[in-house]
């Protein structure tokens, strides 16, 4: 049996719409991600378990794990009866790269089972293709960091598509999932089709400034450049609590940045000192979570990405 773990991720990181993403892991050692296992069987089957198993479509044709297996069989021209198990631990439509977790874990497991027919570049392209079947458009800001780990920028027009961006070791990422769904399709539909020239200039300056600051180890400049002028002004209305209010409160408590994780409704809060983390986490649990499905996790950068695990 082959078993693969794929971690949750924060797409966009405020400043890099459809371009930046980072893989995350809870600092307490918990697993925030999906597991997929595959083994020989007489007949094909998919079994679902995990904290959010009930959010997975019942019909096989709608299951992204099945779609990954079917597409891989088409590419490899091989069809083998297998048993695939998905342990779904990242909520669907949460802004934490839930579909990417399932896609990455599935394709890494399937590719390994088939003798690694595809290299990493080919796998990544296939992951982006499968992500497009879920969200309605091909993008890599979740699948790339989920697969390869770290903070990454995706350059779709060039051969070396996924590039690692150095982060800061003292950065702590608090993520707060309120327990409600916001689909990627819906969150993309609220975005304008065109942006002003000034918005384009500002976006380019923020993103290039952030990348430059990360490479030159200018932490303050990097923090100052985490500004979302592309998605946040339009997606903030989809959140259950006013984002400006949240940002103001967490910054008063010592956070250095706050924004929407991916398409939302999860938000991220960035801290660069440890002594403010507990207070901010407790406050978010009280004022942002909407039901018992919501959670707050204190995370750090996951540098490994997907991994073949034992058991």
Curated annotation (Swiss-Prot):
Q: Name one GO molecular function term.
A: homoserine kinase activity
Q: What is its EC number?
A: 2.7.1.39
What this protein catalyses is: L-homoserine + ATP = O-phospho-L-homoserine + ADP + H(+)
Q: Where in the cell is it found?
A: Cytoplasm
Q: Cross-referenced Pfam families, in alphabetical order? A: GHMP_kinases_C, GHMP_kinases_N
Could you tell me which pathway this protein works in?
Amino-acid biosynthesis; L-threonine biosynthesis; L-threonine from L-aspartate: step 4/5
Chief site of localization: cytoplasm
The domain of life is Bacteria
Q: Which residues bind ATP?
A: 91-101
What keywords were assigned to this record? Amino-acid biosynthesis, ATP-binding, Cytoplasm, Kinase, Nucleotide-binding, Threonine biosynthesis, Transferase
Entry's Gene3D superfamilies?
A: 3.30.230.10, GHMP kinase, C-terminal domain (3.30.70.890)
Tell me the GO BP annotations in alphabetical order.
threonine biosynthetic process
Q: Name one GO cellular component term.
A: cytoplasm
The protein's matches in HAMAP family, at most eight in alphabetical order, are given as:
Homoser_kinase
Its function, per the record, reads:
Catalyzes the ATP-dependent phosphorylation of L-homoserine to L-homoserine phosphate.
Q: Which family does it belong to?
A: Belongs to the GHMP kinase family. Homoserine kinase subfamily.
* Matching PANTHER family: HOMOSERINE KINASE, HOMOSERINE/4-DIPHOSPHOCYTIDYL-2-C-METHYL-D-ERYTHRITOL KINASE
Name the chain's protein.
Homoserine kinase
Source species of the chain: Blochmanniella floridana
